[in-house]
């Protein structure tokens, strides 16, 4: 009786297995030996697709970048630059929140990762199209990445233990309710992100006023480079 055929090894299978390991156990869980065991193949066969662990993690990170919604930067979208940045930031953070262990890789920047570069291209093109000077558009892209990835690196509320005795009022008179934060982790963290995001965009809007006057009444509209096939 013939043996059942093993599924063909592919980049997508390797990335899928690596993503599952990262999500479940963190970056240190990924190794060529571990992946080969999970996939039921020999270790050297992975090198037909990736040169090393770093390339695999880059591909995992890029798969997360590909989940970020960029529709708000399309030429046909009616949202202005501020609304577009707001909605994109929420989508970006949601993708990172679903895969928190890969955030340190994404925080290094897009490098040569295609999906990551598409994100950078979309944001930069939309900001320049809306009237921001290229230098300012670059700073906005950097600022947004710092803010979003930084917020995804850890939970503020989750950093407080669920133990009332840890907060002796003699030592910490203002932390009497801190032990309750862990029970409201999502509400606190998402609320903090939204508050910070709106404050950031308010500040950018003030800086944008001279550029809006310079380019006309429709300056606030996102006018990115045309969509590529």
What are these regions (language model features)?
Residues 117-169, 182, 204-207:
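Hydrophobic alpha-helical bundle segments that form small-molecule/ligand-binding pockets
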Residues 13, 55, 87, 118, ...:
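Amphipathic alpha-helical interaction segments
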Residues 2-10:
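Short, Lys/Arg-enriched anionic-surface-contact patches
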């Amino acid at each position: 009786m013939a043996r059942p055929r093993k599924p063909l090894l592919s980049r997508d299978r390797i990335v899928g297995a690596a993503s599952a390991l990262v999500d479940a156990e963190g970056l240190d869980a990924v190794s060529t030996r571990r992946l080969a065991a999970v996939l039921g193949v020999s270790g050297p066969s992975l090198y037909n697709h990736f040169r090393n662990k770093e390339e695999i993690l880059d591909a995992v990170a890029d798969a997360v970048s590909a989940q970020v919604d960029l529709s708000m930067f399309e030429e046909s979208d009616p949202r202005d630059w501020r609304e577009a940045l707001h909605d994109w930031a929420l989508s970006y953070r949601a993708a990172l929140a679903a895969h928190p262990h890969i955030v340190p890789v994404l925080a290094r920047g897009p490098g040569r990762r295609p999906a990551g570069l598409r994100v950078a291209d979309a944001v930069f093109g939309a900001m320049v199209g809306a009237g921001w000077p290229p230098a300012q558009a670059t700073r906005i892209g950097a600022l947004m990445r710092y803010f979003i990835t930084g917020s995804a690196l850890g939970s503020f509320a989750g950093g407080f233990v669920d133990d009332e005795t840890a907060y002796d009022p003699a030592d910490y008179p203002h932390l009497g309710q801190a032990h309750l934060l862990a029970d409201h982790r999502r509400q606190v963290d998402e609320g903090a992100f939204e508050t910070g995001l709106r404050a950031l965009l308010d500040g950018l809007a003030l800086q944008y006023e001279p550029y809006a006057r310079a380019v006309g009444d429709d300056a606030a509209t996102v006018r990115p480079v045309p969509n590529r096939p």
